[in-house]
């Protein structure tokens, strides 16, 4: 009997069976080891985002901000964890894993109802706080999964159309850890345009507050003004306002002007531009070389921005419609430096009813001037000025309001109009960088082979094909045995 058993183990089939059992055991051991190793990896490494539009992805802007985070931040989540939307839970886990300065605590409002009252928030809210600064900011789940209000009014039901987890979290962390808040005053009384919701949200995400000012009524620029903004005025400023603006700039102030359409001449505004090395060309600009589908007044400017103005620009695709042109000239003082950051090609024309002037035109420019303490000792434009400080006055000009027009920025979401605009705004502040992240669309896109990623192709075709080939080779080898 014993000899029969020994003999059976010497047979070819027995050897093959033993080999198979050994291989299975080895594979099982390898799988266990790999899973143990994978379990120790950080959340941001072991999770792969296969969602449409990469909603779980974290941009370079946020990663830089989190890498520089030097204060401890706490996420207190007042919600039932099991019933929380999976997208929110997954993103919280991935985002907070990027910094060891962030701690997360879930508080169940059903088990601890008094916690909501104590915190002064509703359920499904994340309270982000920093103990060092004593600041807190609340982010509702509704701010993360943004519903389509238009769909609600047209169909009676609404669903999430955007995912804004990254934008809300990075903004909140920036807000609670920052020691200073910058304030923007926008002028009224000249038929100015109003900021779109998209621009207002980006201001808020960058911890910038806004308020209006009528310079004709006040006769001065507010003491707490960090940036004076004039958005596409349709009327000229008065002589007094011109003097006010020029004096403000000469004392180290910051002014941002977006040119508008005016039926009348604007000599006073033109004098402000001229003093800082800019002159408005007549008519509208048509670009024969860099236009949108042959419409020469729909221009893709050449972006020549550098440093902070070029922060996180990838495609450098900006669209401007019916733009006025600027011509750089010699400024009034040698201490003023004027630099263009948006230009047309050299095959462009300033078009009026009477003529067409060919040339290269500037569509966005910045003029700066170093101001000594003697020149600005009575200035109220900077909150942190000192008697021995040297300030930098800054005049930023963009030649068309279409740069931030919601009809363009909301329609062509891949353009970088708002990214460049916010860079131009935050460049006016020493301690503020553009960390505003736009919400990501949740619209479903058809995944055709033309756009399939390499991971999808390998998963769907590559791995099964390798298994089939290996199985066929094993079968063929055994068949020959």
Positions of predicted regions on the chain:
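Short, surface-exposed patches at the edges or C-terminal ends of soluble domains, predominantly
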Residues: 2-481
